[in-house]
Amino acid sequence: MSQAAKNVIVKLIVGAGQAAPSPPVGPALGSKGIKAIDFCKEFNARSANYQPGVPVPVLITIKPDRTFTFEMKSPPTGYLLLKALKMDKGHGQPNVGTMLGSAPAKGPTRALGELSLKHVYEIAKIKKSDERHSLLEMEGIVKSIVGVAKSMGIKVVP
């Protein structure tokens, strides 16, 4: 009995408008028998409405006949939170001084910054447009974003 050919799924995070057949795109698709340049042209055309360089998660489905389809998702929550704070990246130890387990960690508490609930709600609206979040309540998405913000050391204020 021969095994039926199956679809292969490749997950990548590519900068909007910056897909090129160089790593990581080229090797990831080339090893599956797909011409990376075809994906790059289509991705760059579909991501033209994003700011250049915004990281866009992509789910590429490669069929047995070496054709492909791909789904673009909304940018990662951490990226959107940092952009709302007008920062490029956070610091290495966001929650120094907070409770870890039963004893407080040493060092002063360092918050990365503060965001209003309005900013969090705007990020939630972006995430709600994503197909995988479309059935979730807005309150649940906001709570999830607040959790990510807390883990990054960002304080959410009303």
From Swiss-Prot:
First-listed, main subcellular location of the protein, grouped into a coarse class: mitochondrion
GO terms of molecular function: large ribosomal subunit rRNA binding; structural constituent of ribosome
One GO BP: translation
Compartments where located: Mitochondrion
Keywords: Mitochondrion, Ribonucleoprotein, Ribosomal protein, Transit peptide
Transit peptide as recorded in UniProt: 1-73
One GO CC term on file: mitochondrion
Family of this protein: Belongs to the universal ribosomal protein uL11 family.
Assembly and oligomerization: Component of the mitochondrial large ribosomal subunit (mt-LSU). Mature yeast 74S mitochondrial ribosomes consist of a small (37S) and a large (54S) subunit. The 37S small subunit contains a 15S ribosomal RNA (15S mt-rRNA) and 34 different proteins. The 54S large subunit contains a 21S rRNA (21S mt-rRNA) and 46 different proteins.
Note: Present with 3200 molecules/cell in log phase SD medium.
Free-text function comment from the UniProt entry: Component of the mitochondrial ribosome (mitoribosome), a dedicated translation machinery responsible for the synthesis of mitochondrial genome-encoded proteins, including at least some of the essential transmembrane subunits of the mitochondrial respiratory chain. The mitoribosomes are attached to the mitochondrial inner membrane and translation products are cotranslationally integrated into the membrane.
Name of the protein in question: Large ribosomal subunit protein uL11m
Gene that specifies this protein: MRPL19
